[in-house]
């Protein structure tokens, strides 16, 4: 019994020391985004807890709006919408032109929940554009999508859980257009044989995993062979996350 107590005490002490070392490291590095209790700032590069902080914006529309405005993201607030018992949104926005974003979404009539919009802005600045410059020497000018809001259950589960699309907390990304009109498609280029296109798509998928609760790609199943599903599921700041 004494040996067990000594082992338990030693383990807890070691964990406390590791936690203290981590806090010191993050503080000295000047990266508050790597700490779970610091405030989210969209001007900061993504950190270890950025994705969880974005998910924590679900059901906190005023805080999400304040962050978007401070970051220079222009948008229009959509009227609250209710579509039956399980569908609708109270934090819907539509991106507006200008401001700190430079990417157009096609089609332009994209209704998304505010936490999804915040995640997309960070994705553009810190993942998509750097990857495009690295692989093609050009910026992305537009991102094509299959939409966000859709009052439905998860595909393939007729009687199962409701999709995050039912509350505009998800978006399906299908392609990227570069400044020279080059089009990079998830369906055609995920395994299309062009190393640069394949590497770009995998890089933006993996980067999205740091910013969204669930990210599904062609690696997940056939239903996602032509798009990336990216959502901000309402699991809070410490809930389960998934990336495929």
Question: What is the predicted role of each segment?
Answer:
Residues 35-56:
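Short extracytoplasmic/periplasmic juxtamembrane "stem" segments immediately C-terminal to an N-terminal membrane anchor
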Residues 9, 13-14, 162, 169-244:
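Catalytic cores and adjacent binding grooves of peptidoglycan-active enzymes
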Residues 134-168:
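Active-site-adjacent substructure of cysteine-protease-like catalytic cores
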Residues 1-5:
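N-terminal Lys/Arg-rich, disordered targeting/topogenic segments
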Residues 52-60, 112-120, 124, 162-168, ...:
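Extracytoplasmic/periplasmic, Sec-exported soluble proteins
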């Amino acid at each position: 019994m004494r040996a067990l107590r000594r082992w338990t005490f030693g383990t807890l002490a070691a964990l406390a020391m590791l936690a203290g070392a981590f806090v010191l490291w993050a503080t000295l590095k000047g990266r508050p985004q790597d700490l779970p209790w610091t405030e989210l700032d969209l001007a900061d590069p993504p950190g270890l807890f950025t994705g969880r902080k974005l998910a924590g914006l679900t059901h906190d529309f005023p805080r999400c709006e304040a962050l978007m405005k401070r970051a220079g993201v222009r948008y229009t607030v959509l009227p609250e919408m209710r579509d039956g018992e399980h569908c609708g949104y109270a934090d819907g926005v539509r991106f507006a032109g200008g401001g700190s974003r430079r990417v157009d979404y096609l089609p332009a009539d994209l209704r998304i929940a505010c936490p999804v919009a915040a995640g997309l802005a960070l994705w553009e600045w810190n993942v998509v554009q750097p990857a495009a410059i690295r692989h093609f020497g050009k910026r992305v000018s537009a991102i094509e999508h299959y939409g966000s809001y859709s009052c439905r259950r998860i595909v393939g589960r007729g009687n199962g859980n409701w999709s995050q699309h039912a509350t505009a907390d998800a978006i399906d990304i299908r392609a990227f257009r570069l400044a020279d009109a080059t089009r990079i498609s998830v369906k055609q280029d995920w395994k299309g044989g062009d190393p640069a296109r394949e590497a770009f798509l995998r890089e933006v998928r993996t980067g999205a995993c740091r910013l969204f609760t669930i990210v599904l790609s062609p690696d997940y199943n056939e239903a996602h062979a032509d798009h990336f599903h990216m959502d901000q599921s309402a699991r809070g700041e410490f809930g389960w996350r998934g990336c495929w």
